[in-house]
Amino acid sequence: LHIDDVINLYDEIYEHIPKKVFLARWYPSAEHDGNEEYRKAESRISAIKEVVQQLNLELTDLGTRETGTFDIRDVMYHDIRECDIFIADLSGARHNVMIEVGYALKHVKTSRMLFYFQASDKCTSVPFDVSHLNYVPIVDSVEIKTTVKVRIENILEQARNGEI
């Protein structure tokens, strides 16, 4: 066994381990959504960003992109096609998130998708069209740091083992 063979083997394995995560989410506004919903949404965003960082993954969050003017649709479609893991915050059943989920269903294996949902007074359940998908109901954003994180770790483990 030559060192180059070991390096090539490592590179081949590393190439198949998920690194890129796309986050589909709504963009809250205290003025439009109210202070409480805004606070909850910001807490969810902060929690998922923390989890992704802890797992050394690259997050695509179009809401925080700082590259100047760009066509959000082109970037969104490209980044969804290129992501290794697709995460969607279904809370609020926002139209933009549902479009992103629909596009991802065509381009990302469902075994590499993860959804979570926090009910509110305005939106008490996941829309019918996506209710059959595997999603994590959460009461508080802290559950993203526990339950959702474990689900992401499971996806990473399955990818390392070549199962997905």
Where do the PLM segments sit?
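TIR-domain catalytic/interaction hotspot
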Residues: 64-89, 93-100, 106
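Cross-kingdom TIR/SEFIR domain
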Residues: 92-155
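Conserved N-terminal substructure of TIR/SEFIR domains
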Residues: 1-68, 77-80
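Extended, non-globular alpha-helical segments
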Residues: 44-81, 127-164
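Residue-level preference for short coil/turn positions at secondary-structure junctions
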Residues: 17-19, 81-82, 109, 131
